[in-house]
Every structure is written in C-alpha cells, then in structure tokens.
C-alpha cells in the first residue's frame, strides 16, 4: 500500500523560488507596507522581482513578489502577517 504524505514540506524543496500574490485597495502606502512585511521574513527584496497590476477601474492593485523561501514556517509567517494588515484584502 502506498501512503501519500500531503504535508507542504514534501511539496516544496526548500529553499525554492516562491511567488506571493497580494491584493488590496490602491493607496499610497500599500506597496511600502507589504514590502516591509515580506522583508521582515526575507532578505531585502529585489525590485525586479516585484510586479504590479491595477484593476480595470484602478480601485484595487495586486502585487506579485518573488522570494527565495527557506521553509514552510517562513511562508506561513509571511502569509499571517500579510493577512493581519488592514490594507491587504487577499493573499495567494
């Protein structure tokens, strides 16, 4: 019988390249705030690894930030801190 271990540690080979997508209202502080949160858990972010897209009406914005992830704990911590930020609407 084959058992499948579904833990995320087995789904990723850390360290690995990982993309975080963050959505929120389009405001002045949004980019600096989310970059500061992500940098708490990683090294300085590379501006070339950050992409920004506006919604069709410009009310919302999404950022994709590529990082080198070192562990599932690190990813969970980043995700939780972003979710706790009142400027962030959604994190993928």
UniProtKB/Swiss-Prot annotation:
Coiled coil: none annotated. InterPro entries: UPF0250_YbeD-like, YbeD-like_sf. It holds the Pfam family DUF493. Disulfide bonds: none annotated. GO terms for cellular component: cytosol. It comes from the Bacteria. Belongs to the UPF0250 family. PANTHER family: UPF0250 PROTEIN YBED. This is UPF0250 protein COSY_0496. It comes from Vesicomyosocius okutanii subsp. Calyptogena okutanii (strain HA).
